Amino acid sequence: EQRAAERMEALVNDPDPTALPQFLTAVPKGGDLHMHLSGAIYAETYMEWARAETLAGTTKYCINNSSLALATSCSSGVSPVPSPGDALFDQVVRAWSMKDFVPGAETGHDHFFATFGKYGAISGSAHHDDCLADVMERAESENQIYLEPMLFSNSTASSKGSDVWQGGTLTTAALPGFHA
């Protein structure tokens, strides 16, 4: 314990500002339990996917100017999905995440839970594999050794839970993507 305290003290006082972050990155982190996969993806990544799909003509995405939510109904009151460096880009990142959040009229709780609906147009799409790969790569770079991702959308999970609660049964056939 004494050696660990001395090592930490030396890192904190090291004149090299990268010493402590490098050490902390190398430390094994344990696990991330009950991680909702859609909420573990950065807003910037969702916007990158939306821009790419729009450019490819797969799905046309836009940003609702008043709610800052991602939309596929792109008529009036919308803007193209912004790119990094655009003023709207930073606004959308703050709306879709806790970045720079300051409590005020909206609580942290309310802001956090409101974010999911803002990027829902793409998070429930065909990007589950991309989401899982993104989270696994980030975990590896942070030396995190265990992930427990939740792969169901809230509606799927709550409908299955409701069925069981009301006396129904749950089988592996009812669980998309479940491998016995």
Per-region residue spans from a language model:
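Metal-cofactor-binding active-site regions of metalloenzymes
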Residues: E1-A180
